[in-house]
Amino acid sequence: MKKIIFGLIMTAIVVYCASAAGIREEKIMQEANTGAKMDLIGHEWKLIGVYIDGVDTQYRREIQPKEIIICFTLNFDGQIVSGVGAPNRYSAPYTIGENQNISIMMVRSTLMASLFEPYNLTEHDFFTYIQNSHSWRVLNGQLELNSKTADNKNVRLVFN
């Protein structure tokens, strides 16, 4: 009987230590993700470049018609990414994973007709790229989102 009780106590101690280590490791990862996530939050990111399979698509904010200069923006709060397409406002839930992975769910947007089309990027493509984003980084004050096109080409969106 003593051996059974001793065995149960030892098992409980091992399980407790293992779960405490797991909780501690998870807390460290959450703190790291929270710190990295803070780089995203509180800033209105404006799209300045789009690269598909490493090739510059020549999208430039400064050459857009003045009527649509405020387009293709990105704002992160704790749980929702939102912004302006061209011309529609959009939002979507998102999650940040380990190693700067990101998952942006289905984008929902208003349904206004566009009077002016941005050069070299359609709103539909922008929403597709946002929705297909899989990783991110902030480098030299610029946000880079890595994504895929509808036909699975690599996309890099650069925001300032």
Pin down the residues of each PLM region.
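Sec-dependent N-terminal signal peptides
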Residues: 4-13
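Lipid interaction determinants
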Residues: 17-160
